[in-house]
From Swiss-Prot:
Residues that bind D-glucose: D34, E88, G112, Q113, H176, D440
Any GO MF annotation of the entry: ADP-specific glucokinase activity
Organism whose genome encodes this protein: Pyrococcus furiosus (strain ATCC 43587 / DSM 3638 / JCM 8422 / Vc1)
Enzyme Commission number, as recorded: 2.7.1.-, 2.7.1.147
EC supergroup of this enzyme: transferase
The keyword Kinase is annotated on this UniProt entry: yes
Name recorded for this polypeptide: ADP-dependent glucose/glucosamine kinase
Record keywords: Carbohydrate metabolism, Cytoplasm, Glucose metabolism, Glycolysis, Kinase, Magnesium, Metal-binding, Transferase
Cellular-component GO terms for this entry: cytoplasm
Comment on bound cofactor: Binds 1 Mg(2+) ion per subunit.
Binding, Mg(2+): E266, E295, D440
Reactions it catalyzes: D-glucose + ADP = D-glucose 6-phosphate + AMP + H(+); D-glucosamine + ADP = D-glucosamine 6-phosphate + AMP + H(+)
Membership in a protein family: Belongs to the ADP-dependent glucokinase family.
Any one of the GO BP annotations: glucose metabolic process
Encoding gene, per UniProt annotation: glkA
Length: 455
C-alpha cells in the first residue's frame, strides 16, 4: 500500500502536467484590497482597556451582526483569538473605519476570494481566468499578477477582455482590514490555540455584492471560452439587501448550467441567517461547494440539525463522522454533486461520482496550501513540489482510523450511502508566514485540479 508521502509526490507530478490544460475559469464576485495588520498583544490590550474591557469581552463571547463601535471591533478580534477561528464582519460605521485606518497596516495585498484565486490560477498556474472586480482602482489593478488574467470591459457594446493593469479608469478602493495573530498569541488571560485572523470589511461594494454591468448585460459573451466557474462573495449580504444580487447570481447560474459549465461555490462565514437559507435554496444550481467546520455547522443550524452543528464544533480535530453525516444531509437536501470540506489537519470530499482523481486533487490542494503557508506566496506550479518536504499531520491518523472503521476507507477512498468519500491528511507548516488566502488556495486548487485530471 502506498504511503501518504508517495501519494503526495504522485499527485503533484500529475498536477504539474494537467493543470495547465484547463482553458478558462470564470471567477466572481468579490475582489478587494487586503490591509494586513500583524497584531501586537501589548498594543491590543491597551486598546481594549481604552475602549472598555467589559464591553469588549462581551463581544468576544458572541459576535455582533456587524461592527458599529470600536468595542465591537476589538471584541470580534478577541472572539477569533480565543477560538483560533477566522471570522469576517462588515464595518458599517465611518468613525470605526477611520479608527482602523489610523491603526494602520503592515502590508497591502490582493484580497477577496475571486481576486486571490485570479492571482493563483492565472498568475501562478498559468490558467486563463476572467475575474469580476467590483471597483477597479489603480491600486487594485496593480495588485494583480502578470499572466492570463482578464477583466471584461464594454467598448461600443462589444465585450473586450483586458488585463486589469490595462484598465484606463480609476475607481474606488475597497479595503478589508485583516488582523492576524500567531498560535500562542496572548491577550490578558486568553491564548490563541492556533494562528488565524479576523477581517473587518470597510467596503460598500463587495459587502452588497455589487455586480458590474458586463456581468449583468453581457454575461453569455463574457463566458464564451470558459470551462469552469468559481463563485463566492455571497457571505456579506443581509436580509435587507440580498434580493437583487441573488437574482443576478441566479441568472448567471442559469447561463452556466445551460452550457454545462461546472460551478463551484466557495462558501464563507455568513452571519445573516436569511442569506444562509437563500444560499441553501440555490445550492442545487451549483456542481460543487467548499466549506470548513464553522460554515458547515452554520448550514446544519438552518437545516434544524442543532445537535450535529454543535458536534462539528466540539472536537479538535473535528470529528470526521459528524462531518460526513453533515455532508450527506447537505448533498441529499440540495443535490450538489461535490462537497469539499477543509479543516486544520485534514480534508474530505463527498462526491456523487467515484475515482482516485478526487483524492489526488485534494493532495495537490494541500501541497499548494502548505507551499503558500511556508513562503507567503507561490510563484510557479513547480514550486509547490518543495512542500513535499513538509511533514504530514500526525494527528490525522486518528481521523483516518475512525473513517476506516466507519466507512472502510482504504488509501483515502471509501463509500457511504452510494457516494464516494475521499480523505487526506494535510501537511502542517509549523510557523506559517500568513494564513490569508489559504482556504481559497485549497478550494480552487482542488476544484481545478480534479477537473484537469479528467482531461
Amino acid at each position: 500500500m502506498p504511503t501518504w508521502e508517495e501519494l503526495y509526490k504522485n499527485a503533484i507530478e500529475k498536477a504539474i502536467k494537467s493543470v495547465p490544460k484547463v482553458k478558462g475559469v470564470l471567477l466572481g464576485y468579490n475582489t478587494n484590497i487586503d490591509a494586513i495588520k500583524y497584531l501586537d498583544s501589548k498594543d491590543l490590550e491597551e486598546r481594549i482597556i481604552k475602549a472598555g474591557k467589559e464591553e469588549v469581552i462581551k463581544y468576544s463571547e458572541e459576535l455582533p451582526d456587524k461592527i458599529n463601535t470600536v468595542s465591537q471591533l476589538l471584541g470580534s478580534i478577541l472572539w477569533s483569538i480565543r477560538r483560533g477561528k477566522a471570522a469576517e464582519l462588515f464595518v458599517e460605521s465611518c468613525p470605526v473605519r477611520f479608527y482602523m485606518k489610523r491603526w494602520g497596516w503592515n502590508e497591502l495585498r490582493m484580497g477577496g476570494q475571486a481576486g486571490i484565486m485570479a492571482n493563483l490560477l492565472g498568475g501562478v498556474y498559468g490558467v486563463p481566468v476572467i475575474v469580476h472586480v467590483p471597483q477597479l482602482s489603480r491600486l487594485q489593478a496593480n495588485l494583480f499578477l502578470d499572466g492570463p488574467i482578464y477583466v471584461p470591459t464594454l467598448e461600443n457594446g462589444e465585450v473586450k477582455l483586458i488585463h486589469p493593469k490595462e484598465f484606463s479608469g480609476d475607481e474606488e478602493n475597497c479595503i478589508h482590514y485583516i488582523y492576524e495573530f500567531p498560535r500562542g498569541f496572548r491577550v490578558f488571560e486568553f491564548e490563541a490555540p492556533r494562528e488565524n485572523r479576523f477581517i473587518g470589511s470597510a467596503d460598500d461594494y463587495n459587502t452588497t455584492l455589487f455586480i458590474r454591468e458586463e456581468f449583468r448585460e453581457s454575461f453569455s459573451e463574457v463566458i464564451k471560452n470558459v470551462q469552469l466557474a468559481i463563485l463566492s462573495g455571497l457571505q456579506a449580504l443581509t436580509k435587507e439587501n440580498y434580493k437583487e444580487p441573488f437574482e443576478i447570481v441566479k441568472s448567471n447560474l442559469e447561463v452556466l448550467n445551460e452550457r454545462e459549465i461546472p460551478v463551484h461555490l466557495e462558501f464563507a462565514f455568513t452571519p445573516d441567517e436569511k442569506v444562509r437559507e437563500e444560499i441553501l435554496n440555490v445550492l442545487g444550481m451549483f456542481y460543487s461547494v467548499g466549506l470548513n467546520e464553522v460554515e458547515l455547522a452554520s448550514i446544519m443550524e438552518i437545516l434544524g440539525e442543532k445537535k450535529l452543528a454543535k458536534e462539528l464544533l466540539a472536537h479538535d480535530p473535528v470529528d470526521p463522522i459528524a462531518v460526513t453525516e453533515a455532508m450527506l444531509k447537505l448533498a441529499k437536501k440540495t443535490g450538489v454533486k461535490r462537497i469539499h470540506f477543509h479543516t486544520y489537519g485534514y480534508y474530505l470530499a463527498l462526491t456523487e461520482y467515484k475515482g482516485e482523481h478526487v483524492r489526488d486533487a485534494l493532495l495537490f490542494a494541500a501541497l499548494a496550501a502548505a507551499a503558500k503557508a511556508m513562503k507567503g506566496n507561490i510563484t510557479s506550479l513547480e514550486e509547490i513540489r518543495e512542500a513535499t518536504s513538509v511533514p504530514v499531520n500526525e494527528k490525522a491518523t486518528q481521523v483516518e482510523e475512525k473513517l476506516r472503521a466507519e466507512y472502510g476507507i482504504k488509501e483515502g477512498i471509501g463509500e457511504v450511502e452510494g457516494y464516494q468519500i475521499a480523505f487526506i491528511p494535510t501537511k502542517i507548516v509549523a510557523k506559517p508566514k500568513s494564513t490569508v488566502g489559504i482556504g481559497d488556495t485549497i478550494s480552487s486548487s482542488a476544484f481545478i485540479g480534479e477537473f484537469s485530471f479528467t482531461l
